Amino acid sequence: MTTKKADYIWFNGEMVRWEDAKVHVMSHALHYGTSVFEGIRCYDSHKGPVVFRHREHMQRLRDSAKIYRFPVSQSIDELMEACRDVIRKNNLTSAYIRPLVFVGDVGMGVNPPPGYTTDVIIAAFPWGAYLGAEALDQGIDAMVSSWNRAAPNTIPTAAKAGGNYLSSLLVGSEARRHGYQEGIALDVNGYISEGAGENLFEVKDGVLFTPPFTSSALPGITRDAIIKLAKELGIEVREQVLSRESLYLADEVFMSGTAAEITPVRSVDGIQVGEGRCGPVTKRIQQAFFGLFTGETEDKWGWLDPVNS
């Protein structure tokens, strides 16, 4: 059984009804985690439905596949057009989009056989705020997990791979068991890495800080957008290693990601962050970000890809 979220899924070049998009139980990815994926949003904007940073997401999908040596036959342009097609086919104006490349039923054994191919799907469906409808305004409570992010020489953090998210499951589920909305992972050196499924930012004395990729953080596309928007707003941005206690002493903390968007963190480990609500710097960045879709913020980077172009 599956919870139907839309009518159609793009599956290896064909539009397949949601309930018919099936894979074999012996698919390699089910046994060994051999998949890479993306999370993308389509916003109902002043220009109509637009996919945010579409090309960058599809480039990262192919980059993730390249790191793991997964063959992908579709070009970036073909993947982008397939994405637009599935949004139109499902009559969506606002959606979460999930492209997925996975190794199917190619036989048992950790190493796929020579000449194997991958399967590619793109799903699009309505999905609201990842961490709750009120989280964008009121913020969430987070905890630092007992589970660390893996060292980059064990699991490549630049790849958005399915298997990597078992770590996220441990970080996030531990937090929820203890009554928090989200978990925060440290790297193997004890410095802040990222949230269970989000990048992390701190504000101190008007300066915006975020951990570097060397702290085992995913190169987030929303993270990159925030850095660019913040600089446009005249906010100083520093990428540097951050200690756990810096979260307690920050004026503001927020998480970022395609699903989480820009979600304030009002407490960490039960310690209130700043005033315990969405702070002024976070609010300015939120307004600039969401202003991209209302026209209040100029899209000078060409980040909005119209679905009906």
Curated annotation (Swiss-Prot):
GO molecular function terms noted in the UniProt entry: branched-chain-amino-acid transaminase activity; L-isoleucine-2-oxoglutarate transaminase activity; L-leucine-2-oxoglutarate transaminase activity; L-valine-2-oxoglutarate transaminase activity
Domain of life: Bacteria
Enzyme class: transferase
This protein's record includes keyword Transferase: yes
The protein's annotated pathway: Amino-acid biosynthesis; L-isoleucine biosynthesis; L-isoleucine from 2-oxobutanoate: step 4/4; Amino-acid biosynthesis; L-leucine biosynthesis; L-leucine from 3-methyl-2-oxobutanoate: step 4/4; Amino-acid biosynthesis; L-valine biosynthesis; L-valine from pyruvate: step 4/4
Listed InterPro entries: Aminotrans_IV, Aminotrans_IV_CS, Aminotransferase-like, B_amino_transI, BCAT-like_C, BCAT-like_N, BCAT_family, Class-IV_PLP-Dep_Aminotrnsfr
Positions of disulphide bridges: none
Modified residues (N6-(pyridoxal phosphate)lysine): K160
Catalysed reactions, as listed in the record: L-leucine + 2-oxoglutarate = 4-methyl-2-oxopentanoate + L-glutamate; L-isoleucine + 2-oxoglutarate = (S)-3-methyl-2-oxopentanoate + L-glutamate; L-valine + 2-oxoglutarate = 3-methyl-2-oxobutanoate + L-glutamate
The UniProt record lists the keyword Nucleus: no
Biological-process GO terms, alphabetical: aspartate biosynthetic process; isoleucine biosynthetic process; L-leucine biosynthetic process; L-valine biosynthetic process
UniProt keywords, alphabetically: Amino-acid biosynthesis, Aminotransferase, Branched-chain amino acid biosynthesis, Pyridoxal phosphate, Transferase
Cofactor: pyridoxal 5'-phosphate
E.C. number: 2.6.1.42
GO cellular component: cytosol
PANTHER family registered for this protein in UniProt: AMINO-ACID AMINOTRANSFERASE, AMINODEOXYCHORISMATE LYASE
Subunit structure of this chain's protein: Homohexamer.
Function: Acts on leucine, isoleucine and valine.
Similarity comment: family membership: Belongs to the class-IV pyridoxal-phosphate-dependent aminotransferase family.
Name by which UniProt lists this protein: Branched-chain-amino-acid aminotransferase
UniProt source species: Salmonella typhimurium (strain LT2 / SGSC1412 / ATCC 700720)
Taxonomic classification: Bacteria, Pseudomonadati, Pseudomonadota, Gammaproteobacteria, Enterobacterales
